[in-house]
């Protein structure tokens, strides 16, 4: 799966904004078929950062969310600003 096909959009709520600031974590809506490795590879290639950890879940509404924790040397807030999420 191509990196640009994996991520559908950035997911922004009060909770994800707090996670962005306190835990250095970005939240995305991704394709249901995407694996954690697909998400990690896509974020690293598209945004030029190093990913430490990816957690995924499928919501009751049927879409898949990915919580992507960046390595300490990168700031999630900088990436979110580039994306226009903050």
From Swiss-Prot:
Family annotation (PROSITE patterns): RIBOSOMAL_L23
Q: Which controlled-vocabulary keywords does the entry list?
A: Ribonucleoprotein, Ribosomal protein, RNA-binding, rRNA-binding
Q: Name one GO biological process term.
A: translation
Q: Show the Gene3D superfamilies listed in the entry.
A: 3.30.70.330
Q: Which GO terms describe its cellular component?
A: ribonucleoprotein complex; ribosome
Q: What's a Gene Ontology MF term here?
A: rRNA binding
Read off the Pfam families from this record. Ribosomal_L23
State whether it acts alone or in a complex, and with which partners, per the record: Part of the 50S ribosomal subunit. Contacts protein L29.
What this protein is reported to do is described as:
Binds to 23S rRNA. One of the proteins that surrounds the polypeptide exit tunnel on the outside of the ribosome.
The protein's name is: Large ribosomal subunit protein uL23
Organism expressing this protein natively: Aeropyrum pernix (strain ATCC 700893 / DSM 11879 / JCM 9820 / NBRC 100138 / K1)
Q: Which gene encodes it?
A: rpl23
């Amino acid at each position: 799966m191509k990196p640009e096909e994996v991520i559908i959009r950035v997911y922004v709520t009060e909770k994800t904004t707090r996670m962005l600031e306190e835990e250095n974590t970005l939240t995305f809506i991704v394709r249901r078929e995407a694996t954690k490795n697909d998400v990690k590879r896509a974020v690293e290639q598209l945004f030029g950062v190093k990913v430490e950890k990816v957690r995924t879940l499928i919501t009751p509404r049927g879409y898949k969310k990915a919580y992507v924790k960046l390595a300490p040397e990168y700031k999630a807030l900088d990436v979110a600003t580039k994306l226009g999420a903050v």
